[in-house]
Amino acid sequence: MQVILLEKVINLGNLGDIVKVKDGYARNFLIPSKKARRATQTAIAEFEVKRAELEKAAAEKLAAAQAEGEKLNGLNVQITQKSGVDGRLFGSVTNADIAEALAGQGYKLEKSQVRLPNGPLKMVGDHPVSVALHTDVVVDVTVSVVGESV
């Protein structure tokens, strides 16, 4: 199925690109999340009329994400978990825990925006974590996991 992208989609294209994707991906993800529309002649004509408006909205989202990223970049977040004597945690620190800790400091993030490349954190110490605020804005945050003896 051919679709017109209404915003930048990672590994697919930019705003206004007409791309061919699998039907299920278009019907179940791109179209319901308003990231794309079917590429019919009328849809293409309507898109060209609204193109400047959509580009302006995308630029505003990017500027807001960059401003938020400047505040968030290099931030140190401290999370306390129960741990054993050897520094291993009972349980783990997940992206939801990190998003919740950042929300406590006044940053609104979804847990899907926190990227843990090696999975949940299972050791006490400082761990670098990436936070994707926008497809083009990724900042680094240091998560300090402090062990609480049982």
Curated annotation (Swiss-Prot):
One of the protein's GO biological processes: translation
The record ties this protein, via InterPro entries, to: Ribosomal_bL9, Ribosomal_bL9/RNase_H1_N, Ribosomal_bL9_bac/chp, Ribosomal_bL9_C, Ribosomal_bL9_C_sf, Ribosomal_bL9_N, Ribosomal_bL9_N_sf
Write down the Pfam families for this protein, in alphabetical order. Answer: Ribosomal_L9_C (PF03948), Ribosomal_L9_N (PF01281)
Residues folding into a coiled coil are none
* UniProt superkingdom: Bacteria
Provide this UniProt record's keywords sorted from A to Z.
Answer: Ribonucleoprotein, Ribosomal protein, RNA-binding, rRNA-binding
Q: Name one GO molecular function term.
A: structural constituent of ribosome
Kindly state one GO CC term assigned in the UniProt record.
Answer: ribosome
- Functional description taken from the UniProt entry: Binds to the 23S rRNA.
Family stated for the protein in its record: Belongs to the bacterial ribosomal protein bL9 family.
**NCBIfam families, per database record:** L9
Q: Return the protein name.
A: Large ribosomal subunit protein bL9
Tell me the organism. Cupriavidus taiwanensis (strain DSM 17343 / BCRC 17206 / CCUG 44338 / CIP 107171 / LMG 19424 / R1) (Ralstonia taiwanensis (strain LMG 19424))
| Gene field | rplI
